[in-house]
Structure formats: C-alpha cells, structure tokens
Amino acid sequence: MFFFANCPGPCFRENQAIADILREIDDPNFVAVSLTCDPDNDTPAALAHYADRFEADPQRWKFLTGDMDVIKRVGTKTFLLPVEIGVHSERGAVFDRQGRLRGSYHLLQEDRVNRLKKLIRDVLAEEDVAAGAEETD
C-alpha cells in the first residue's frame, strides 16, 4: 500500500489494518509492503520509527522509500494506481510469488478487508501446493 508517515488522514488506520492482517495470517510466506509517497520526509530512519508504532516484524513487513519517480512508476505500472506526494490510495494489493497482481481491496471497509484476507489465504494455498509439488520431483 502507499502511505506517508505524517498523513493527517487514513494512513495510520490503513497500516493498523495491515498489522491486524499480519497477526491473523501468521505465515512467513506472507510479507506486507508499505511504500511511502513522501520520500523526502519519510527517510529510512523515519520509517523505522513509524514501523515501531505497529511493532512491525521487519522480516514480514517492509516499510520502503526511494526515488519519487520510481515510486510513481511502481504505482502506475505495477499497482495500477496513481501516486503523487501526499496523494495515495486506501487500497491493499495482493501479489503472488510470480509478481502478478491478484487483486486490491479497500483497507478501511471490513467486508473488503475480509475479501483481502481470503485472497491472501488462497494465494498462499496455491503457493503451498506448488511448493509441495516441487519438493516431490
């Protein structure tokens, strides 16, 4: 998801939703990424401090920053979302291990979060089946 640490709006609640999902789906193959849309202010140190507010496990939840032009390209080409400084979506997206976008859902609507969790579980189950098949060859 795209966010910024000083957001006066929904970003904290969106990241809280991700924290809740990570607690519920306790699978090491499920990794969440929160990508800032304010890289000038959201330095790695600032993001580390922000992540601490959620007791984020850095192995399972990445808070990322970078060059704004690259972040914009990732938003439009990968997430299919427009991204500008201070402008972001309230959506969480699911990608499989092949990097394919499988779906995105609004993080502040309970019914949508439930669908997001189902999709995550479905994708993890697909990966488990694939991993199991690979192990037997």
Named regions from a protein language model:
Residues 75-81, 99-100:
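Short, surface-exposed amphipathic charged segments that create phosphate/polyanion-binding patches used
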Residues 9, 45, 72-73, 103, ...:
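Alpha-helical elements of the RecA-like P-loop NTPase motor core of helicases
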Residues 61, 78-93:
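Structural micro-motif
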